[in-house]
Regions:
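The feature represents the membrane-entry module of six-transmembrane cation channels
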Residues: 2-565
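Intrinsically disordered, low-complexity serine/threonine-rich segments
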Residues: 555-582
Length: 582
């Protein structure tokens, strides 16, 4: 069935049909090493797709994009394949010597196979090399019950304790935390201070659909730009700049409030308004945008300014789609969950008794771990500390990337280039601002160094702290840069007006504030006077539900997106697992 596609080191195991060989293999390899690689999971996904396309009949009806449930895949694919290979687990069939565990995957078995693989492959931590997943790690043709007699010594527990990362896979049917084994894994994560993340599916198809829906707005903007250039409509262009500012602010605020439809409208209006100035020349734009240089440098800055704002609205639309997906995953993780693992169940009475005995009187602590995960999308010691101090963590694990990507990418490179030009061509290009703006160089250098330090710190932090850092940057830069600089954009006082100078200093030094909170982290921020309120500001997101949200179904039904979605072969949702198959 696998067409001999496995790596060569697994071939000697193919003809070992004896149960005792499989038992000895699993005894020889530590349970925490019953792992697969990213490539193994992609191979598993492709093989299941292949057998479906070849006409294998599964014992249930299923949607092609989701695939059959894991229960059915286990019975009709995993068991037969591993039985033919020698009755070892699928993981040891692929990697007979085992692999060190980096990632522990929790799921609930009722999820559909392509939901599971899509979410795990999309959310796989980039530093993780190997993953432990019960359906592929445990030998499904052997006596699994014998492995679970002591929950604390089960393969689940040993693998989780060895892992660096933990991923919970929601599904569209029921919360994984209605399963007691999944609750027990949350207990183990609490005991060993693991960070738990929620897996989510790929959003590239939805993002592509959203960009296609923005194409008419782009055409409208370009058309208005042509008309304005021909007619020299300066007053009208100033109105368009005002619309751009309003759309930019609406896009930022609506994402922080979870107003997805308002965000959609703002991104369309913003893209149309900025597209007007793609056609017009730079001198017209520079009447309303203050540029500290002259000549070709000024023209280059004008064009980069326009392009950055144009790119912002495209990235903001990706953020909107991602935010909506995160909301849907949060809802899936809460489906039928009754607020405590006291109500969770086990398929085996013996397992339930053993698990509840091991958790003992720490049920409330486990419930807090799960509650933080349900609210934030991430559960960690730092976030739990914030939660216990009364910080609202709703969707704290979601970050807006549009602002950080711009200020840490093209705008940072632009700043470095301007500093280089200022130093090399001080007598020629920099004279206009050197006379009236002598502090430009030290302020700009401070801004650049702060952002570089932020990037270095970001690479060394855990995922929960990284989310906090990006949220800090998005909110502080939004407040200090976008809003105030947009006010300056509409001013008539020229670049060297007092307002422009103040705004430049505030924008540049705002990155020192960002770096300050990044160094403190979540726990350090909580210790500051008013720390709870600051953490609330940085972490929380006001979510307005109801008719303001665009659903995935609405996206799929739109004519612009129907062709893109019709080509989709993998989607959606999955859950967390330690429940053994019977």
């Amino acid at each position: 069935m696998l067409d001999g596609s496995l790596r060569s080191e697994t071939v000697p195991l193919w003809h070992r049909g004896m149960t005792d060989v499989a038992i000895e293999l699993h005894k020889a390899v530590h349970p925490a090493r019953w792992c697969i690689t990213f490539a193994d999971l992609k191979f598993f996904q492709s093989e299941v797709r292949r057998v479906i396309q070849d006409g294998m009949t599964f014992q249930e009806n299923f949607e092609a994009s989701y695939g059959p449930s894991m229960y059915v895949v286990n019975e009709q694919y995993i068991k037969p394949v591993t039985a033919a290979a020698g009755k070892m687990s699928w993981a040891l069939m692929m990697n007979p010597d085992g692999l060190d565990c980096d990632l522990f995957i929790t799921h609930a078995w009722q999820e559909d196979v392509f939901e599971f693989t899509d979410k795990v492959l999309t959310s796989w931590p980039w530093r993780a090399r190997h993953a432990w997943c019960c359906m592929l790690a445990n030998p499904q043709n052997l006596d699994i019950g014998a492995l679970l007699q002591s929950p604390s010594m089960s393969p689940f527990a040993l693998a989780l304790q060895s892992s660096k990362y933990m991923l919970v896979v929601p599904n569209r049917h029921k919360s994984v935390y209605t399963r007691l084994w999944c609750g027990y894994e949350a207990y183990l994560a609490f005991q060993s201070n693991k960070i738990i993340r929620t897996a989510s599916p790929s959003i590239w198809r939805e993002a592509l659909c959203s960009w296609l829906r923005m194409f008419p707005a782009l055409l409208v903007g370009l058309t208005i730009g042509v008309v304005s250039k021909v007619g020299q409509l300066d007053l009208f262009l100033q109105f368009i700049l005002t619309m751009r500012m309003i759309a930019l602010l609406a896009s930022l605020v609506s994402q922080h409030c979870g107003l997805m439809r308002l965000c959609l409208v703002a991104n369309h209006v913003g893209l149309a308004s900025i597209s007007v100035f793609i056609i017009t020349d730079g001198t017209l734009w520079s009447k309303y945008v203050h540029i500290p240089f002259s000549g070709m440098t000024a023209l280059l800055l004008v064009n980069i300014h326009r392009i950055c704002i144009w790119v912002y609205f495209l990235l903001a639309e990706v953020d909107r789609v991602n935010c909506q997906t995160e909301m849907e995953e949060a809802e899936a993780l809460q489906k039928q969950y009754q607020g405590s693992i006291r109500h969770a169940s086990c398929s085996e009475v013996r397992d339930e008794v053993n698990i509840r005995h091991e958790i003992g009187d720490q049920v409330d602590e486990v419930d807090k771990v799960i509650q933080v995960l349900l609210k934030a999308g991430i559960s960690s010691d730092a976030l739990r500390a914030a939660y216990l101090q009364g910080v609202e963590l709703r969707h704290a694990g979601f970050v807006q990337l549009a602002i950080p990507v711009l200020v840490l990418g093209p705008l940072l490179l632009l700043g470095c280039g301007l500093v280089g030009q200022y130093i090399v061509l001080l007598d020629e290009a920099a004279d206009p601002i050197a006379e009236v703006y002598p502090f430009w160089l030290p302020v700009q250098c401070t801004s650049i160094l702060a952002r570089l330090a932020f990037l270095c710190l970001f690479c060394r932090r855990s995922i929960d702290e990284q989310c906090f850092m990006l949220n800090v940057m998005a909110k502080i830069v939004t407040a200090f840069y976008v809003f105030m600089l947009e006010l300056s954009t509409l001013g008539n006082g020229g670049f060297c007006s007092e307002l422009s100078i103040v705004l430049f200093i505030v924008y540049s030094l705002s990155f020192l504030v960002v770096l300050f909170f990044a160094v403190l982290g979540i726990r350090g921020t909580l210790k500051l006077p008013g720390g709870r309120q600051l953490a609330q500001f940085f972490l929380s997101r006001l979510v307005v539900s109801g008719n303001w949200r665009l659903s995935r179904t609405q996206l799929e039904s739109s004519p612009e997106c129907s062709e893109v979605f019709s080509q989709s072969t993998g989607d959606a949702s999955d859950s967390s697992g330690s429940e053994s198959s019977s």
